């Protein structure tokens, strides 16, 4: 038997063992790593957003606010003198180990599912979103119980992989959605008893409350509610693919590792698809560097492909607040000419039988307007993304960008349909809010058992 055959035997044996251990259960409780709560359960100065929404200014603010803020692990600073042996990733790992050795962070003694409640204000009302922190068994090749809706980029994956390999810890969770058609999971997530184990208010004003549940019947009920999946990735595609890559590398190095090794799992925050507090913000498009000719060409194409209605600027936000128009795509546009344009299109752009991804407002905008026009220009305009409509319009008014396009929020049902079909949305099609925090509870990703 050569090396290739031996590896295949080991891989097949491990896959069968994982299946025997887990059965239809794709999630597991775990011994979470958390901040020591002996002094205070308020972790407001210690949690951080996930790495990809931390600006330089916010990073500096978090660092200055608390010497133990988790941003030091989630998004470590680079130094000019960094080398392959000593760099931002090795510093993050050293910080994590230092906090563990000093008791700043502790690992819970018993395995738990951790219930998170996030209370926030949006669209003029208050919301409470609930989810469960759990370990999700990483799929083997060909298994489709974790479904994606978004493509990934090499650079963020390389960054997260180096951090994961250095720390051997999942520092922030992947936000996943369970279809939960019978609302079994949603009902269980609402059963929070007693005072939370930890609370935190983040820089956006979101209040986070965490409960650790260890009762055997409750753990079993959560696993049963999620069952064999599928789970849909809402936020964290790069972290998910990174976890799979890391898992594969660890298996090559440690072919005899147990199926229960922590690297076979990823940390996730799982929410119910039926939770109305599972909000998606619209992500608007700004096109900068068009020039006068490019703006004129975009307006010409806009009128050729869509029904265009001109409105006063006071109506600028109405496209996001209007009721859905069945079978119709509704978009907004602004190019600084004191008018707000409402664009509509229907079956002429997405006929009956069109794929789930082709039927999205964001796909119609890109496929029938932005991408065709940009392809005809000699210059290379820059496409940027914002969630705040007023910021987009201000950028046009300042002359920084030539065109702003406004989208209605993608619906959760659309995300699930695209993922189920195996399609990929255009980049920045979804912005789930609020983000799952980094540092509230993290998980081991080493070869140790979960």
Where is each model-derived feature located?
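Surface-exposed, charge/polar-rich loops and edge strands
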Residues: 2, 10-450
């Amino acid at each position: 038997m050569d090396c290739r055959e031996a590896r295949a035997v080991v891989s097949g044996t491990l896959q069968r063992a994982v299946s025997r251990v887990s059965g239809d259960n794709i999630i597991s409780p775990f011994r979470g790593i958390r901040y020591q709560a002996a002094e205070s359960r308020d972790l407001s100065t210690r949690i951080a957003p996930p790495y990809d929404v931390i600006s330089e200014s916010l990073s500096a603010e978090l660092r200055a606010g608390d010497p133990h803020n988790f941003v030091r692990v989630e998004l470590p600073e680079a130094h000019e003198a960094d080398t392959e042996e000593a760099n931002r990733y090795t510093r993050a790992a050293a910080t994590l180990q230092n906090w563990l050795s000093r008791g700043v962070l502790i690992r819970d003694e018993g395995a738990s599912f951790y219930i998170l409640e996030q209370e926030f204000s949006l669209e003029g009302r208050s919301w409470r979103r609930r989810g469960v922190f759990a370990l999700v068994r990483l799929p083997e090749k060909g298994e489709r119980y974790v479904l994606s809706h978004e493509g990934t980029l090499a650079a963020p994956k390389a960054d997260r992989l180096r951090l994961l390999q250095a720390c051997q810890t999942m520092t922030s969770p992947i936000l996943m959605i369970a279809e939960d058609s019978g609302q079994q999971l949603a009902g269980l997530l609402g059963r929070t008893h007693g005072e939370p184990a930890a609370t935190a208010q983040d820089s956006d004003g979101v209040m986070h409350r965490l409960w650790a549940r260890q009762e055997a019947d409750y753990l079993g009920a959560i696993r049963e509610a999620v069952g064999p999946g599928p789970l849909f990735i809402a936020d964290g595609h790069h972290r998910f693919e990174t976890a799979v890559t890391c898992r594969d590398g660890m298996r090559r190095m440690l072919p005899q590792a147990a199926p229960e090794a922590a690297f076979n799992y990823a940390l996730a925050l799982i929410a119910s698809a039926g939770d109305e507090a599972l909000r998606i913000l619209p992500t608007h498009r700004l096109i900068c560097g068009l020039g006068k000719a490019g703006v004129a060409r975009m307006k010409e194409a806009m009128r050729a492909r869509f029904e265009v209605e001109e409105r006063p600027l006071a109506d600028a936000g109405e496209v996001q607040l209007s009721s859905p128009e069945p079978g119709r795509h509704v978009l907004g546009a602004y190019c600084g000419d004191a008018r707000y344009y409402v664009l509509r299109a229907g079956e002429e752009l997405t006929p009956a039988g069109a794929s789930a991804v082709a039927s999205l407002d964001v796909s119609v905008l890109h496929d029938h307007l932005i991408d065709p026009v940009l392809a005809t220009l000699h210059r290379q305009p820059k496409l940027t993304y914002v969630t705040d409509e007023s910021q987009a319009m201000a950028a046009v008014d300042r002359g920084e960008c030539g065109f702003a396009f406004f989208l209605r929020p993608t619906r959760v049902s659309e995300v699930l349909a695209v993922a189920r079909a195996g399609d990929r949305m255009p980049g920045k099609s979804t912005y789930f809010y609020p983000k799952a925090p980094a540092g509230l509870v993290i998980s081991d990703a080493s070869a140790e058992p979960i």
